[in-house]
């Protein structure tokens, strides 16, 4: 159960961290679902065509970054509405994934790719009864997600570049006046976020499936957007948020196998209901550290500085 929960939460972890990087520079990207779908479809296609898991992941990340580049150009350079642009990006990503998915609908993930997602055991720790096999025997993608979340935390909170990012998210005008290249940092973080979203989508399509399945993300991108708030824009808390949602989803699958008189549709709703309850709880606790970047969702007009 724990092993499944961690694996289920991993693609969401990638998307949450990607979303945090984007929102930290003041851009609310509701296109996470679209970027995940683009990464999922292109990653699956490249995996089938080459049998190389590394190329598949790089292609998936590039697809997510391409979607993020479109978003960045419209919202940073053209100063378009961030909410509308994000929604359009999700619709666009859904269409792209449907197109690519149609081309590879008869293909299967090669064994060379599937074998890359075999569990990697941590010496000694993986031998701990029950907990060891569930937690310390995971595939390389799970460990990569954890490493990226930790690196993102140190990048945002312990480096000069991270200080620039946080300054831009709070007050881009003041950051610009102090000599920080606001546009450059916005582009970099939005593209990095898109790359991570693409990786999350590819994990869903290549590690969990053998054949293509339309709408493979099943709303994971939207959940990630909500869990960004749950994690209070902290990549370390994102680990807990993602795995908690993974546990709720895993519990849903497990309970459906029990002989209890609860509609399966209600069980499917449980993770989403829990997410809403948590968001309400966080909204009621008006703590300073729980607040989003002050410039989140606002276009920056340098001439009005």
Place the predicted regions along the sequence by residue.
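Transmembrane alpha-helical segments in multi-pass inner-membrane proteins
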Residues: 197, 207-272
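Hydrophobic core segments of alpha-helical transmembrane domains in multi-pass membrane transport
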Residues: 15-16, 40-44, 94-95, 142-154, ...
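Hydrophobic alpha-helical transmembrane segments
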Residues: 2-5, 34, 54-62, 84-87, ...
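Membrane-interfacial amphipathic/re-entrant helices at transmembrane-helix boundaries
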Residues: 1-15, 28, 42, 50-55
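Helix-loop-helix "hairpin" substructures at the membrane interface of multi-pass membrane proteins
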Residues: 134-212, 235, 240
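Cytosolic-side transmembrane-helix boundaries in multi-pass membrane proteins
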Residues: 170, 176-177, 181-184, 255-305
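Transmembrane helix-bundle core of multi-pass membrane transporters
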Residues: 94-158, 259-267, 293-305
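Alpha-helical transmembrane segments within multi-pass membrane transporters and channels
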Residues: 51-96, 249
